[in-house]
C-alpha cells in the first residue's frame, strides 16, 4: 500500500482531548478499510498565517498513513464534513520518517530559559547617551588631527 503524510488543522476552541478523539476516529476508519497510522505527532496550538473560517489559531496534527487511495479519499471526505477540521493536506511519500519532524525539533531546540534578558546590547533608555553617541573632548579631536597630519606626511614622503 502507498504511504502518505497528512497534516490536519483543528479549530482553536477544540480541546486537546477532542483532537486526540478525532485522531482515534481516523485510526478506526483506516483499520476498518485495511490501513493504519504509522506516525502520530501533535504539534499543539499554533498561529495560522491567515484566518481560516474565522480562526486565527489551530491544533496541528501530523499523521503518517499506510492505506489505499480509496481509503484516503474516504478519509478526506469524512474530514471535510467534520466542522472541527479547518484544513487537511495529504502528500504521498516514499517512506515515513520515524524521527520527529522539523517542526517538533525546532519547538524543542535548546534555547533554554532566557531569564529577564530581552535581547540587544543597547542601554535601557533611548536618550541615555545623548544624540550621536558620547561627546568627544577637544583633546581627542587634537589627537585625531595629529594622526591625520602624520598620515599626510607619510603619503608625501612615500610619493617622493
Curated annotation (Swiss-Prot):
GO biological process, one term: translation
One cellular component (GO) term of this entry: cytosolic small ribosomal subunit
Region feature (Disordered): 100-160
Gene3D superfamilies for the chain: 3.30.70.60
Family annotation (InterPro entries): Ribosomal_bS6, Ribosomal_bS6_sf, Ribosomal_S6_plastid/chlpt, Transl_elong_EF1B/ribsomal_bS6
Annotated Basic and acidic residues bias: 106-116, 136-160
Molecular function, one GO term: small ribosomal subunit rRNA binding
Alphabetized UniProt keyword annotations: Ribonucleoprotein, Ribosomal protein, RNA-binding, rRNA-binding
Residue ranges that the Swiss-Prot or TrEMBL entry lists as coiled coil: none
Sequence similarity: Belongs to the bacterial ribosomal protein bS6 family.
Function: Binds together with bS18 to 16S ribosomal RNA.
Protein name listed in UniProt: Small ribosomal subunit protein bS6
Originating gene: rpsF
